[in-house]
Amino acid sequence: NGNVGTLLYVHGNPEGAYQDFKGCMTIADLTEQFVQAKISFDDALQIVQERKIVYAPDATMQAMLSDQKGRVLIVEPGIGWREDDGRCSLITNYSILAPESTVPFLVPGDDRYERTAQLLSTYGKQFTVTDAFSVLQAVRQEGIWATRVSFVYSAKEHAVYYVENNHFSRIERYEFS
């Protein structure tokens, strides 16, 4: 359906702790309903404005949701949300909305988000799928925590391009009908 949801583990904060009451929704439920097209992007936006988004009972995660039109919603339980409409969006395993809250939990040398942002800033208005994969390849992880899937969505083509297990010479394409 063109909806994509990415959940990333993050060090939790008390404000996002799981709560089981009607005014709350877990980040996992929000993401799952969006990916399954049970809710639209606009519905997700309304939900984050009206309800408290909390962690799942057994995991602390944040999410990036995007639709076929290229609209992006970053949701961090207990911290807030942000709608992005630029040419690209980034998320990582620490807070984007309140980075100072997760600074104590950063792994030394894990500067992929910063390196990616820097690389992206060097591109002009013309930014291709090939350019995006060059950036992803430059910041990929290897070893035990290796990047398993890297993907790029082209809103213009309504297609997602992806690479599995860092095999950047084998870019696959899936077009949404």
Segments predicted by a language model, with ranges:
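Short arginine-rich
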Residues: K52-T60
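Short N-terminal edge-element motif at the start of the domain
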Residues: D20, T31-Q49, I53
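C-terminal, well-structured catalytic/ligand-binding subdomain of enzymes
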Residues: N1-Q36, M61, S66-S177
